[in-house]
Curated annotation (Swiss-Prot):
Name by which UniProt lists this protein: E3 ubiquitin-protein ligase NEDD4-like
Residues with PTM Phosphoserine: S312, S342, S446, S448, S449, S464, S475, S479, S483, S487
Posttranslational mods: Phosphorylated by SGK1 or PKA; which impairs interaction with SCNN. Interaction with YWHAH inhibits dephosphorylation.
Species of the source: Homo sapiens
Catalytic activity of the protein: S-ubiquitinyl-[E2 ubiquitin-conjugating enzyme]-L-cysteine + [acceptor protein]-L-lysine = [E2 ubiquitin-conjugating enzyme]-L-cysteine + N(6)-ubiquitinyl-[acceptor protein]-L-lysine; [E2 ubiquitin-conjugating enzyme]-S-ubiquitinyl-L-cysteine + [acceptor protein]-L-cysteine = [E2 ubiquitin-conjugating enzyme]-L-cysteine + [acceptor protein]-S-ubiquitinyl-L-cysteine
Length: 975
């Protein structure tokens, strides 16, 4: 059935009484669940109109399918004739599947009784709302939101009905902006006032908003205000006074930014703006009223004087007895945590700003301290989430992103980096003032960090709580108690794009980035984020559509043959490569070339001699599913270790691969995964993470023959070094020092157990007499605690200021050497059967790690520079350009898997891809044209070669490459 709208209307017929036409627009989906093996979905939406009481379906329509995305944009409108009192709309999101049944992605059930009515005189007749997708049953795995616009078409009954509808709508979370309101020209929605203390907003399983009063444990549909809860003022005053006293008790104020937003509890949809009063007098007016949104165009710009008067009228600033006198405007994220807090001395103009120009001047800011009278006007700062206070992210007419600093009315192309400095602890409340930290704008030339949180050590280290914490940490090294040297701070999830707490990145005069550790007051060239292995970093693969705008001065054009190229108007050059993919944060860290290591390695290889009276090769035939035990029996059965120096020849059962180097690299890779698996009890994770390994001191309890297995592992490590292969493992630094026979120092413990290190360092810098420590250690094994003397009769010798250095040395010796001495001796026994230990000692502990395990990070630029092409391919061939683009868009883990797919190992030689070895010596990575576009790529690991078919599109190449890397296993032919 069609109407004057020119669109079909579903549902009831026109002669039905009390019916209205509902316009429904399915706008988009947000962060839907992944159903595809490639991390995407093909979503569409089914709209079902049904009678609520009878569960009878009246109409069913469906949107189009959006391919390969988790954030689809449909923008499709439908019209329904409904009875608002007893009809409902069910929105179901599905992932289209051509082979099997479509996967369920979530649903939203919406009642129709409280929807707004359109006003034809308004510029924006109705607004959208994000609905949390709900599961259909407890087995459903859904996530994300569905963005909808729903409003009734106006009747001919006049304006009274509309006004009545609007008043009713405002009570249920929908907002209809009045056309006569001055804020109707704004692009932002007018936010509701904040909830009273003790109230919480939630959404039920039907998508309806309700409010919970935690003070008297009741719920209601109506949004409360401070006027509604005046009868409970005594409880509110007592509760907020307790919170204010708690804040004044704290030695300083912590301002931090969440590293990863979390979904809000109960499915709450993030609200726009709210006013939070920081330590204000409850007797005064503390209700934060909603501020007007910024103007939509230059024509509707509000003058600073008018905005100042409006803010002065709406914000009630009442000083309390302590002189803490202001309210801070913040933006509440889904995690409902404090992001930034700012009070400036001028009103920021919210008008439309021109595209970026050079930043001019520094933002003016003021510090409000106790006893000072603040200015009557408080700046309304429009802040984009994740940016410093007063900064906003916008896009120009060409889609390029720029940043607006409303504090000093400037624009810039560079994303601001917020530096949050925390003051030292202080015992008095008068020193716990709030300070404004100005954002610093830098142009990072390496891995950038949007946020740096500086954690200063606590003052007053001689306080009794600190001493107790040190003593507890020393008495029980496995104690989870936090270190007394770091100030309390929110526990964030590890996110690769952020530096660790207390670190900062700066640029040296020569353009090289360096890193400052404010915790230890040291600097280093090494990025602290790269201490995490690639499989522990959380940065996901990039989408070509999410790269953002081109850098300033760049232009994208289409060639006559349909290929995209890029013009740099700054240097007047053209290139095929996308400049956005050349960011060091995407390409990976540069390979730190070491000439000294190269010379040592060449000398080391010359001194290794192969005995003359051994067979031509050492053969092993193994099963993949039992590689550990079969390798152990085969290698330990060799009575003469020199036989292992013959050429390795590995065969996997039921595979036809010929080992010319590639199968052996695969064997070392798979065997490393098994040998170093803590499940077998030979190794364990260090105290601070779950990827760095150390010898398990209790390995004898797990395996009676554990020393024989350590000898086997030593032989495998010696085999790898002798034959130029790499192990896949991460060991603590003291492990390599023990191999070299070097003394382990206190600094070596910092990266292994930071809490234990901080405790020992405190003892070194202070008098430990009052701690009542003895020369003994409490060791816990399987729930039982044992006391171990560090020296004869150590439990009777007290640690004093005179003998504390001896105590620290004995603790380190016990922690790293004494407990695992037998295991390390067995490991070195097997290792030195193939390599003389004196020859190994020409390397230091860092170089020994690189010799045995190589580099864990992939520098794509270095990989690309040391690659060759055959059979019609060249560096500028479209398929080659697509291949490297696909590699750049991969996350670090997928690059490692690709490297393992084409070379047989997941590690890179010390000096990069220039030193890749094949079956007959150095062999650069090679890409050769082969096959037809219907086939998957194939690899020859012995020659470091990838056979790549001439695919017709980038999407096809990327899909086939990922499929080959993630699903291929086994050898056939020469490898």
């Amino acid at each position: 059935m069609a109407t004057g709208l020119g669109e079909p209307v579903y549902g009831l017929s026109e002669d039905e009484g009390e019916s209205r036409i509902l316009r429904v627009k399915v706008v988009s989906g947000i962060d839907l669940a992944k159903k595809d093996i490639f991390g995407a979905s093909d979503p569409y939406v089914k709209l079902s109109l049904y009678v609520a009481d009878e569960n009878r379906e009246l109409a069913l329509v469906q949107t189009k399918t959006i391919k390969k995305t988790l954030n689809p944009k449909w923008n499709e409108e439908f019209y329904f004739r409904v009875n608002p009192s007893n009809h409902r709309l069910l929105f179901e999101v599905f992932d289209e599947n051509r082979l099997t049944r479509d996967d369920f992605l979530g649903q939203v059930d919406v009642p129709l009784s409280h929807l707004p009515t359109e006003d034809p005189t308004m510029e924006r007749p109705y607004t959208f709302k994000d609905f949390l997708l709900r599961p259909r049953s407890h087995k459903s795995r859904v996530k994300g939101f569905l963005r909808l616009k729903m409003a009734y078409m106006p009747k001919n009954g006049g304006q009274d009905e509309e006004n009545s509808d609007q008043r009713d709508d405002m009570e249920h979370g929908w907002e209809v902006v009045d056309s006569n309101d001055s804020a109707s020209q704004h692009q932002e929605e007018l936010p509701p006032p904040p909830l009273p203390p003790g109230w919480e907003e939630k959404v039920d399983n039907l998508g309806r908003t309700y409010y919970v009063n935690h003070n008297n444990r009741t719920t209601q549909w109506h949004r409360p205000s401070l006027m509604d809860v005046s009868s409970e003022s005594d409880n509110n005053i007592r509760q907020i006074n307790q919170e204010a006293a708690h804040r004044r008790f704290r030695s300083r104020r912590h301002i931090s930014e969440d590293l990863e937003p979390e979904p809000s509890e109960g499915g709450d949809v993030p609200e726009p703006w709210e006013t939070i009063s920081e330590e204000v007098n409850i007797a005064g007016d503390s209700l934060g009223l909603a501020l007007p949104p910024p103007p939509a165009s230059p024509g509707s710009r509000t003058s600073p004087q008018e905005l100042s008067e409006e803010l002065s009228r709406r914000l009630q600033i009442t000083p309390d007895s302590n002189g803490e006198q202001f309210s801070s405007l913040i933006q509440r994220e889904p995690s409902s945590r404090l992001r930034s807090c700012s009070v400036t001395d001028a009103v920021a103009e919210q008008g439309h700003l021109p595209p970026p120009s050079a930043p001019a001047g520094r933002a003016r800011s003021s510090t409000v301290t106790g006893g000072e009278e603040p200015t009557p006007s408080v700046a309304y700062v429009h802040t984009t989430p994740g940016l410093p206070s007063g900064w906003e992210e916008r896009k120009d007419a060409k889609g390029r992103t720029y940043y607006v600093n409303h504090n000093n009315r400037t624009t810039t192309w560079t994303r601001p980096i917020m530096q949050l400095a925390e003051d030292g602890a202080s015992g008095s409340a008068t020193n716990s003032n709030n300070h404004l930290i100005e954002p610093q704008i830098r142009r990072p030339r390496s891995l950038s960090s949007p946020t740096v949180t500086l954690s200063a050590p606590l003052e007053g280290a001689k306080d009794s709580p600190v001493r107790r914490a040190v003593k507890d940490t020393l008495s029980n090294p496995q104690s989870p108690q936090p270190s007394p040297y770091n100030s309390p701070k929110p526990q964030h999830k590890v996110t690769q794009s952020f530096l660790p707490p207390g670190w900062e990145m700066r640029i040296a005069p020569n353009g090289r980035p360096f890193f400052i550790d404010h915790n230890t007051k040291t600097t280093t060239w090494e990025d602290p984020r790269l201490k995490f292995p690639v499989h522990m970093r959380s940065k996901t693969s990039l989408n070509p559509n999410d790269l953002g705008p081109l850098p300033p001065g760049w232009e994208e054009r289409i060639h006559l043959d349909g290929r995209t190229f890029y013009i740099d108007h700054n240097s007047k050059i053209t290139q095929w490569e996308d400049p956005r993919l050349q960011n060091p944060a995407i390409t990976g860290p540069a390979v730190p070339y070491s000439r000294e290591f190269k010379q040592k390695y060449d000398y080391f290889r010359k001194k290794l001699k192969k005995p003359a009276d051994i067979p031509n090769r050492f053969e092993m035939k193994l099963h993949r599913n039992n590689i550990f035990e079969e390798s152990y029996r085969r290698i330990m059965s060799v009575k003469r270790p020199d036989v292992l120096k013959a050429r390795l020849w590995i065969e996997f059962e039921s595979e036809k691969g010929l080992d010319y180097g590639g199968v052996a690299r695969e064997w070392f890779f798979l065997l490393s995964k098994e040998m170093f698996n803590p499940y077998y009890g030979l190794f364990e994770y260090s105290a601070t993470d779950n990827y760095t390994l150390q010898i398990n001191p209790n390995s004898g309890l797990c395996n009676e023959d554990h020393l024989s297995y350590f000898t086997f592992i030593g032989r495998v490590a010696g085999l790898a070094v002798f034959h130029g292969k790499l192990l896949d493992g991460f060991f603590i630094r003291p492990f390599y020092k023990m191999m070299l026979g070097k003394q382990i120092t206190l600094n070596d413990m910092e990266s292994v157990d930071s809490e234990y290190y901080n405790s020992l360092k405190w003892i070194l810098e202070n008098d430990p007499t009052e701690l009542d420590l003895m020369f003994c250690i409490d060791e816990e094994n399987f729930g039982q605690t044992y006391q171990v003397d560090l020296k004869p009769n150590g439990s009777e010798i007290m640690v004093t200021n005179e003998n504390k250095r001896e105590y620290i040395d004995l603790v380190i010796q016990w922690r790293f050497v004494n407990r695992v001495q037998k295991q390390m001796n067995a490991f070195l026994e097997g290792f030195t059967e193939l390599l003389p230990i004196d020859l190994i000692k020409i390397f230091d502990e860092n170089e020994l790690e690189l010799l045995m395990c190589g580099l864990g990070d992939v520098d794509v630029n270095d990989w690309r520079q040391h690659s060759i092409y055959k059979n019609g391919y060249c560096p500028n061939h479209p398929v080659i350009q697509w291949f490297w683009k696909a590699v750049l868009l991969m996350d670090a883990e997928k690059r490692i898997r690709l490297l393992q797919f084409v070379t047989g190992t997941s590690r890179v030689p010390m000096n990069g891809f220039a030193e890749l070895y094949g079956s007959n010596g150095p062999q650069l990575f090679t890409i050769e044209q082969w096959g037809s576009p219907e086939k998957l790529p194939r690899a020859h690991t012995c020659f470091n070669r990838l056979d790549l078919p001439p695919y017709e599109t980038f999407e096809d190449l990327r899909e086939k490459l990922l499929m080959a890397v993630e699903n291929a296993q086994g050898f056939e032919g020469v490898d």
